[in-house]
C-alpha cells in the first residue's frame, strides 16, 4: 500500500460549504431528503439544510425537453438559499437517484468535474424505512458532495482538497463496490472515479492516473446495467476530463493524453 500523503494544511480554515437537500420526488410516503440530510449533518466541512417547499418535480425525469426547467428551478433555489450544492432525489421503481447541482453549472469555467446528469443511485428501501446507510455508502455520498463543490478562492480550494483527502482515506478502507448489489456497480464506480479525479487531477502522478482510469473503465465494463444512455455518456465524459487534465499536468506523453481526451469526449 502507498503511504498516506500528508493532509493539505486546511484544518484551521474553518470553511463550511452549504448543502441544500430538497425533499425527493417520490410516489410513496417517505422522507428521503430528510433522511439524507440527517445522515450528512455531522460531516466535516458541510453545513446541511433541508428544503421541503412543495412544487412539481416532474422535470426530474431527465428527459431533454424538461432539462432546462430542472436547471432553472435549481438555480432559483440556489439563489434563494445561497447554497454551494443542491441535491435532488427522484424515485425510479425501487431506487432513488441523486443528482447534484451547483451555481451556473454550465456557464462558469473551472467548475467541478460533477455534472448535473451524474446520477448516484441508492436503494429506496433505505429511505422508505428511514434506515441508517452502510458506512461505505455514507462516505460515498459525502465524497460526491465534496467533489461537486465549485471552488474559486485559494482557501476554498485548500479546504476542498483537505476534505477529499480525508474521505478518500475512508473510501480506500471501504469496499464500496460490494456495499450495494451488482446493479449499482457502474454508478458507484463512476462516483469513486469522480472523487479520486477531483483530488488527484493536478498531481501529475502516473499511479493516480491509472487508479482513476481503472475506476471509470470498471464502470464502463458494467454498462449493460446502465438503463439511460445519458449515464454512460457521463462516464466517457469523465474519462475525457481525466485525459484532459493529464495533458496539463503530466508532460511526458501529451500527444497520447490529448488523443485520449478527444476519443472519450467524442464517445460521450
For every predicted segment, state its role.
Residues 1-2:
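Hydrophobic, helix-forming membrane-interacting segments
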Residues 7-76, 86-97:
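Short beta-strand->alpha-helix linker/helix-N-cap micro-motif
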Residues 8-13, 117-162, 170-191, 226:
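TPR-adjacent "capping" and linker segments in tetratricopeptide-repeat scaffold/adaptor proteins
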Residues 67-142:
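Amphipathic beta-strand/beta-sheet edge segments enriched in Tyr/Trp
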Residues 125-130, 167-186, 202-203, 217-235, ...:
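Flexible helix-coil transition and linker loops at the boundaries of alpha-helical arrays
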Residues 145-163, 197-211, 243-260:
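Short coil/turn connectors between adjacent alpha-helices in alpha-solenoid helical repeat scaffolds
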Residues 189-196, 215, 229-243, 257, ...:
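TPR/Sel1-like alpha-solenoid repeat signature
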Amino acid at each position: 500500500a502507498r503511504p498516506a500523503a500528508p493532509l493539505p494544511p486546511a484544518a484551521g480554515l474553518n470553511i463550511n460549504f452549504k448543502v441544500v437537500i430538497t425533499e425527493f420526488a417520490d410516489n410513496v410516503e417517505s422522507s428521503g431528503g430528510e433522511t439524507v440530510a440527517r445522515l450528512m449533518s455531522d460531516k466535516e466541512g458541510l453545513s446541511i439544510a433541508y428544503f421541503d417547499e412543495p412544487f412539481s418535480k416532474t422535470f426530474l425525469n431527465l428527459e431533454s425537453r424538461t432539462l432546462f426547467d430542472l436547471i432553472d428551478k435549481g438555480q432559483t433555489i440556489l439563489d434563494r438559499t445561497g447554497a454551494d450544492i443542491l441535491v435532488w432525489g427522484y424515485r425510479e421503481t425501487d431506487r432513488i437517484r441523486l443528482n447534484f447541482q451547483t451555481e451556473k453549472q454550465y456557464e462558469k469555467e473551472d467548475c467541478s468535474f460533477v455534472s448535473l446528469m451524474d446520477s448516484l443511485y441508492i436503494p429506496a428501501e433505505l429511505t422508505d424505512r428511514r434506515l441508517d446507510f452502510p458506512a461505505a455508502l455514507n462516505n460515498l455520498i459525502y465524497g460526491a458532495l465534496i467533489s461537486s463543490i465549485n471552488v474559486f478562492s485559494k482557501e476554498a480550494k485548500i479546504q476542498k482538497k483537505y476534505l477529499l483527502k480525508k474521505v478518500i482515506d475512508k473510501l480506500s478502507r471501504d469496499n464500496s463496490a460490494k456495499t450495494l448489489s451488482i446493479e449499482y456497480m457502474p454508478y458507484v464506480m463512476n462516483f469513486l472515479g469522480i472523487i479520486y479525479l477531483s483530488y488527484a487531477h493536478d498531481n501529475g502522478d502516473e499511479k493516480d492516473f491509472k487508479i482513476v482510469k481503472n475506476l471509470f473503465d470498471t464502470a464502463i465494463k458494467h454498462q449493460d446495467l446502465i438503463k439511460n444512455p445519458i449515464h454512460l455518456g457521463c462516464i466517457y465524459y469523465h474519462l475525457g476530463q481525466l485525459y484532459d487534465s493529464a495533458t496539463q499536468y503530466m508532460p511526458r506523453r501529451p500527444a497520447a493524453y490529448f488523443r485520449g481526451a478527444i476519443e472519450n469526449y467524442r464517445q460521450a
